[in-house]
């Protein structure tokens, strides 16, 4: 007698490595300073915290599924039409929605090497083929992306600034990429770290989305706004794209407390400016300290985000540095799972944290010589 077939997941799931979040504990289980998830070291705006607390009496209620007040606040802050804004459970949800709405079986989803790990996952979830274009020394190569476009390409993802490298491409490069894509291809510009860019480095993505029919720009409240726990993202595009994504978006996907906290966070631009200044100062200081170790094989990839990527190309390995920092109570992001076993991504933390990490790495380099 033939055995009954067993329940099995789709075959492509076996090829997906489970996501490993940044650790908040050392290898032996001790609490650690977490410099592995690119969270805001200044925490959260006091105004956002107060708005969150005030939402406690609404726990029995469903949230506004359209997040009207939040979309209006985003529109006011960024000078955008609220009707062309969609909200999500983090920007991750919107990235998945974009792939689901515009790609599928026999289609291709294109992205640069060394970019956000969600992009290939979003492609596979909808049966599309993920296609990786070569980078240019840890930076997105527009020419390589355009060369990789085929008649099957339906979605192109880029992160600007990029994660995990921290590099960015210019407005002219973004425009070149868009101009080189067919009109039936959706360009998704993931701007999770855009608020850390100097104003003169604006890549023009929101303006491009405002004036075109095939550009989607995503942003998040998890980074500079300090609301990572609430998982709130948003995106901007033409009405047709927003309508398509809203049709497949889960209802009630952002909590009442999260919506209220995000509105308050947008209104507290003093906190945002303080976060920006702190990050710029200590990222610059840390990168300068690490540049002093270049003769020992430590290479700094200049960052425009709230983290720095270090390449270990000498006798000191990234794995050794990762474990040593753990021993000193600091968790960072070692990246063998992203084919960067020679790299550490280090979140910009407090003044003390950055001084400690710089001192530890300097001592390790001297010991390895």
Curated annotation (Swiss-Prot):
Enzyme superclass (EC):
transferase
Effect of pH on activity: Optimum pH is 8.0.
Q: Name one GO biological process term.
A: L-histidine biosynthetic process
Q: In which pathway does it act?
A: Amino-acid biosynthesis; L-histidine biosynthesis; L-histidine from 5-phospho-alpha-D-ribose 1-diphosphate: step 7/9
InterPro entries, A to Z:
Aminotransferase_I/II_large, HisP_aminotrans, HistidinolP_aminotransfase, PyrdxlP-dep_Trfase, PyrdxlP-dep_Trfase_major, PyrdxlP-dep_Trfase_small
Catalysed reaction per UniProt? L-histidinol phosphate + 2-oxoglutarate = 3-(imidazol-4-yl)-2-oxopropyl phosphate + L-glutamate
Q: Organism's domain of life? A: Bacteria
**List-wise, which residues carry N6-(pyridoxal phosphate)lysine?**
223
Q: Establish whether keyword Lipid biosynthesis is in the entry.
A: no
Q: Name the Gene Ontology molecular function terms of this record.
A: histidinol-phosphate transaminase activity; pyridoxal phosphate binding
Cofactor(s) it depends on: pyridoxal 5'-phosphate
Which family does the similarity line name?
Belongs to the class-II pyridoxal-phosphate-dependent aminotransferase family. Histidinol-phosphate aminotransferase subfamily.
List the NCBIfam families: hisC
Function text: Catalyzes the conversion of imidazole acetol phosphate to histidinol phosphate. Can also transaminate aromatic amino acids and histidine in addition to histidinol phosphate.
Record's protein name: Histidinol-phosphate aminotransferase
Organism, by scientific name, is Zymomonas mobilis subsp. mobilis (strain ATCC 31821 / ZM4 / CP4)
